[in-house]
UniProtKB/Swiss-Prot annotation:
InterPro entries: ARM-like (IPR011989), Quinoprotein_ADH-like_sf (IPR011047)
Region ranges (Disordered): 139-158, 330-356
Protein name as it appears in the record: Uncharacterized protein TP_0487
Compositionally biased spans, kind Polar residues: 139-149, 336-349
SUPFAM superfamilies reported for this sequence: Quinoprotein alcohol dehydrogenase-like
Organism: Treponema pallidum (strain Nichols)
Length: 525
């Protein structure tokens, strides 16, 4: 093989027996690629010569890797950019190397090494005996004279300090100012950057594996594992926890809260969003109180006659309940009489935009069709829910509330698409009116089914009832089962398909069995 040629900044391939420009055995200069047969040094003695190679050649020597089980953990700050950490899991050996191939230290762990990460002042090791913190910035090198008269460096062994006795650590993550340890039983422990002080500790209702990932986004800590995505606050409070499909791929969490996972051939996306439930402005106006047993309003303090009270402003975020006469008390008749102790001043409610249920349902349907629901969604949802849950109260205020309009309200409530609307519809599945029940099933079809079995069990109660023979009702139930089979997790999807298959071959009318069979065939295609 060739020697190091003079005049070149990057060394060429050197002789395996020595590291000088001329061979010590023959003293001849060889060319690149030539083999020196006169060299008396064997390959087994090459390691002895290479130990004393000049430092200029060590920076081109690759990092020593004994097996494929070695893993490298990158440094977590600028103070440890001049070092790399390698660990050998099966043997339980941890070694600390510099980027120039110089061994800084070694540690023999009791048991196998489960996880390892670097810190600004050293590294943290997770073994079968717990978590260990090792400081490498305080190690001093002392010169030692060898027999050949050459100076070599003798390194002091690092002293590990146990910071936790919990033995099931599966992953370690180091950020700029925090060290996070994940355990197999769902425990999460956070320490400072050096691993000296514990910041918080909590146990989540899940399990972690070695495929877990961690990311710090602003003041939030985002954790992801197989079929699991979690968001924690900087203080350790649980903010978001969702179970995803069982998949070998770890979910991806983006900066805007979007979680993407792969389940089979399906790519799923979830987004953690915040909905505006209510916003009620407070105005500086006189106080009112309601007289029990009467719908009249008594004024506490009358406005001065020279300065009449200004009409209250209406906000687009106000709920329809507060301004719609369909849901408010009827306007009392004008009366100028006086009571024995005080004079009552009667006021009427301002006219609302939806005086009848038809106008309300038409407005919600138009907003959904045009896609401009916006901040009116809480008001729409409350009005539709009140129309469903308080039929007697609604009929007393407006006799035009019928079963068909209540069914349409249930369908529109499910079309709004929020998860909390699904729970409201599931509570109303005990309705005895088939028309309203059909509307509730249509609303569930357009709403999210979630990851639990509540919706599927509720559909079972409808399809397996003794009097479940109405064609329109069973068609709506089949549509809901098909929607559950398309959007629910795999276990719930299989149960929904099995229920559709049972309906297609059960004791139902021919039209219902044919409709269920068509849905199953469309899903199979």
């Amino acid at each position: 093989m060739g020697f190091l040629q003079p005049g070149h900044t990057r060394p060429r391939i050197c002789c395996p027996a020595c590291c000088h420009a001329r061979c010590k055995a023959c003293g001849e200069r060889g060319e690149r690629g030539a083999v020196h047969r006169a060299c008396n040094f064997k390959r087994r003695t090459a390691a002895v010569h290479h130990r004393t190679r000049p430092a200029v050649l060590q920076q081109y020597r690759p990092a020593p890797v004994e097996s494929e089980a070695w893993r490298k953990a990158p440094p977590s700050s600028d103070r440890c950019k001049n070092a790399r950490i390698f660990h050998h899991g099966p043997a339980g050996t941890v070694e600390y190397w510099s980027i120039f191939g110089e061994k800084k230290g070694a540690l023999r762990a009791s048991g196998s090494v489960r996880a390892l990460t670097s810190t600004p002042r050293g590294y943290v090791v997770a073994t079968d005996q717990g978590l260990w913190r090792v400081r490498t910035d305080t190690l001093n090198s002392t010169p030692d004279k060898t027999q050949a008269g050459k100076t070599a460096k003798q390194h002091q062994a690092p002293v590990p300090v146990r910071i936790s006795t919990q033995r099931s650590c599966v992953a370690l993550f180091a950020t700029e100012n925090m060290l996070i340890a994940l355990f197999a039983d769902g425990a999460v422990r956070a320490y400072d950057a050096d691993g000296e002080n514990e910041l918080f500790s909590l146990t989540l209702p899940c399990t972690f594996s070695s495929a877990a990932q961690c990311r710090v986004q602003g003041d939030e800590i985002v954790l992801s594992d197989t079929a699991r995505a979690i968001t924690l606050s900087a203080g350790g409070a649980l903010k978001w926890n969702i179970s995803l499909y069982e998949t070998p791929f770890t979910p991806l969490i983006t900066t805007d809260g979007l979680v993407v996972s792969a389940g089979g051939w399906v790519l799923n996306a979830y987004r953690a969003e915040t909905r505006l439930i209510d916003h009620t402005p407070i105005y500086n106006r006189d106080s009112y109180f309601h007289v029990l047993g009467s719908s009249r309003r008594a004024h506490v303090q009358e406005a001065p006659p020279s300065r009449p009270a200004a009409p209250a402003k209406r906000s687009p975020y106000d709920s329809i309940f507060s301004s719609d006469p369909f849901f408010s008390s009827p306007a009392p008749a004008k009366n100028s009489g006086k009571t024995d102790n005080a004079q009552e001043t009667h006021t009427t409610s301002p006219p609302g935009p939806y005086a009848t249920p038809e106008l309300l349902l038409q407005a919600v349907q138009t907003s959904l069709k045009e896609g401009n629901v916006g901040p009116r969604e809480p008001a729409y949802a409350r009005s539709l829910h009140a129309l469903l849950t308080s039929p007697h109260h609604a009929r007393a205020r407006a006799p035009a509330v019928t079963s068909a309009r209540r069914a349409q309200a249930a369908t529109l409530l499910g079309a709004l698409g929020a998860h909390e609307y699904r729970d409201a519809l599931l509570e109303l599945l005990k309705e005895q009116d088939y028309t309203v029940l059909e509307g509730i099933l249509k609303g569930l079809t357009r709403c999210t089914f979630g990851l639990d079995e509540r919706a599927l069990l509720a559909l079972y109660r409808v399809t397996r009832a003794k009097d479940a023979r109405a064609e329109s009702l069973m068609r709506a139930a089949c549509d809901a089962l098909a929607a559950c089979a398309r959007s629910a997790p795999r276990t719930l999807s299989e149960k929904a398909v099995s229920e559709l298959s049972r309906i297609s071959t059960g004791a139902f009318p021919y039209t219902i069995r044919a409709y269920a069979r068509t849905l199953v065939q469309s899903m199979l295609r």
